[in-house]
Amino acid sequence: MNKKQKKVLIRIIAASVMMILFAFIPVEGWLEFVLFMIPYLIIGYDILLKAFKGIKNKQVFDENFLMAVATVGAIALGDYKEGVAVMLFYQIGELFQSYAVGRSRRNISELMDIRPDYANIERDGKLERVDPDEVVIGSVIVVQPGEKVPIDGVIIEGSTTLNTSALTGESMPREAKAGDDVISGCINMTGVLKIKTTKEFGESTVSKILDLVENSSSKKSRSENFISKFARYYTPAVCYGALALAILPPVVSMLLGFDARWGEWIYRALTFLVISCPCALVISIPLSFFAGIGGASNAGVLVKGSNYLETLSKTKYVVFDKTGTLTQGVFEVVGVHHSKLEEARILEYAALAESFSSHPISKSLQRAYGKEIDQSRVTDVKEISGEGVTAVVDGVSVAAGNTKLMKRLGIEYSDCHSVGTIVHMAVNGRYEGHILIADREKPNSKEAIAQLYRMGIKETVMLTGDTGKVADQVAGDLGISTVYSELLPGDKVAKVEELLSKKHSKEALAFVGDGINDAPVLSRADIGIAMGALGSDAAIEAADIVLMDDDPLKIAKAIKIAKKCLRIVYENIYFAIGVKIVCLILGALGIANMWVAIFADVGVMVIAVINAIRALFVKKL
């Protein structure tokens, strides 16, 4: 509890003790009024001040105004105990709500406790602690065992085990050695590391993640926007309704010659006011989303706003980019089928020609070549999107790519019956063979697809630039229902738009990619999910939801979290509105008294808040 909450608690205890004591003192009239005004002012002075300021600023209709009118009215009717009780229980509810929100915020802060407090820089043979913001790109920082890695960089000395659980939600540590990239927010567990920074702190992974989580509350869901608008019109409506309930029945009774019974009808109107307070909805709905986003963060699923959580819960179609999402994206050369030119020379030409590309296939060719790449040997490089590359290597014309490239160049090629990615090679316009490259499926991909179907996903779709043979085999192995192969990057956007046009307006389509070249498709889908986005700025920028590791099972987990959060939101909406409608009718009929009204207001709010906090707990999903 913070200092403000402790002060409110002391006031609640003091007012409660006084109220109980004064209830046993046999006094009446003005003395009873004076006695009960003491606990009333102790517990309610701030509510009265807020109500007065609201009236002064022409912002009349809020819960403070409702409570002030209801309690002052009850005291004016001589119902001192009820007046104090309404204010007392309202403050108890507010304290509970404040504590619950603070607790969920603390939980999220603890879960996302990845912001480093300092960075160690070596100066004159000594380690000096500096603010991470002061460290420039290219600086060498030292990270001791037990410390957080403060800034993204490359390990230049040392080896260790890194704990990435605060980022990924997974407890499995990761080995790291000299030459490996390392991201901020990880905890160094064993060895001393020297890291050369590659980013400023403000651009590092930890800063982007914290900024994403902190700003998530600004993007509100349709449910939250509905409740905000609802409260804006609902509160004035019930105030006028209560006024009508207090005035019209007595006036009609007088006109008909009956007893007006003003006191009874005013009491009913005050009860009506207390019951109608919209706190349960106004507080619990945003809290449900806030807790849901916090729970997702703990599981390594970063959600940029409650609107995305709401859309994700409606997902019925999941579209995957194959490479790096369902497969490991680690391509390996598994065979070289050559004619006259020897295998080593084909690999050399392919590796050099592809050396200017960042595509995983080019990386695999360079690994298979196994020697240092001298790019000065390569000239006139032309990369043709979705086909391959042409270049001049040591004065020799080289073409490396798929069948489309061979057809473009008018070169006759041989088909390969093995399943994998085929890189056809032509040297000086003559076909010299092909290189077979294979990607491995991720261990959990098949189970991830099965989980999606068990959750009610209607269709899974795989988009890939690979050949139909490779794509069909992967889709068949994993149980994917629809596959589109041999697509150019631009074709993927067109396919997603085609799928979007077929679905029902109340259903959502999610696209899952690894963030590499996927930004246009991530932006076009109803929900863009970037997988394994640790350290990927483009993915964090383009996606609506970021999975911090590359486990496909996290996709189903993210949808389960969204569904649980929305289920809690609707439970609170139906429960709060249902109880209030029943109690409002009973209050208007004179059946419900002020004590029932207290339950309908404070009791419902407390129950709704407790229910909302359940959204934090997602480990067993």
For each feature predicted by the language model, list its residue ranges.
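Helix-interface capping motifs at the ends of transmembrane segments in multi-pass membrane proteins
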Residues: 17-34, 41, 53-62, 68-83, ...
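P-type ATPase nucleotide-binding
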Residues: 333, 337-459, 468, 480-496
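Membrane-embedded transport module
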Residues: 241, 503-506, 543, 548-621
